[in-house]
From Swiss-Prot:
HAMAP family: PPAT_bact
Protein's UniProt name: Phosphopantetheine adenylyltransferase
CDD domains listed in its UniProt record: PPAT (cd02163)
Cofactor(s) demanded: Mg(2+)
Locations listed in the record: Cytoplasm
Name of the gene: coaD
Binding annotation for ATP: 14-15, 22, 93-95, 103, 128-134
A GO biological-process term: coenzyme A biosynthetic process
Superkingdom per UniProt: Bacteria
Length: 169
């Protein structure tokens, strides 16, 4: 078994789009590790609203002020990605009890695939506990105000997606 570098944490997700909840989690994790790698997954099965490269750029823009945070897009098995960046800890956010069952199942599978890597769960600050990318996308799609949930650049990207869809109709 490989010994993983516990000083490198990997925070994987689709980040479609990155939200203030994601940013909060990374901001609180950054002081705990030498390096936090935010892995932006391609996730074609989820049918992302934003292309991978745009999600990577938006995440870099939102997290660039952290000197020890690196944002990387990936389209491989998470276990392979974690090993490729020499991660030793997987970071996952738990917003509510409803997240726990899925996250527990994923942590168990990851323990099987990459036993040298530990999963660490962090809970969001209370003001972010109800934010999810899927809710943000849906509210934005329907013309609602999501400015309190995402950075300005993400708000603009979602506005452009909505306008492009409206132009196609």
């Amino acid at each position: 078994m490989t010994v993983a570098n516990r000083r490198i944490a990997v925070y994987p997700g689709t980040f479609d789009p990155i939200t203030n909840g994601h940013i909060d989690l990374v901001s609180r994790a950054a002081p705990l590790f030498e390096k936090v790698v935010v892995g932006v997954a391609q996730s074609p099965s989820k049918g992302p609203a934003l292309p991978l490269e745009q999600r990577v750029q938006l995440a870099r823009g939102a997290l660039g002020h952290h000197g020890n945070v690196e944002v990387i897009g990936f389209d491989t098995l998470l276990a392979h990605f974690v090993r490729s960046v020499q991660g030793g800890v997987l970071l996952r956010g738990l917003r509510a009890v409803s997240d726990f069952e899925y996250e527990f199942q994923m942590a168990s599978m990851n323990r099987h695939l990459i036993p040298e890597v530990e999963t660490l769960f962090l809970t969001p600050a209370e003001q972010h506990s109800f934010i999810s990318s899927s809710l943000v996308r849906e509210i934005a799609r329907l013309g609602g105000d999501v400015s309190g949930f995402v950075p300005a650049a993400v708000l603009e990207a979602l506005r452009k997606v909505r306008e492009a869809k409206a132009a196609q109709s």
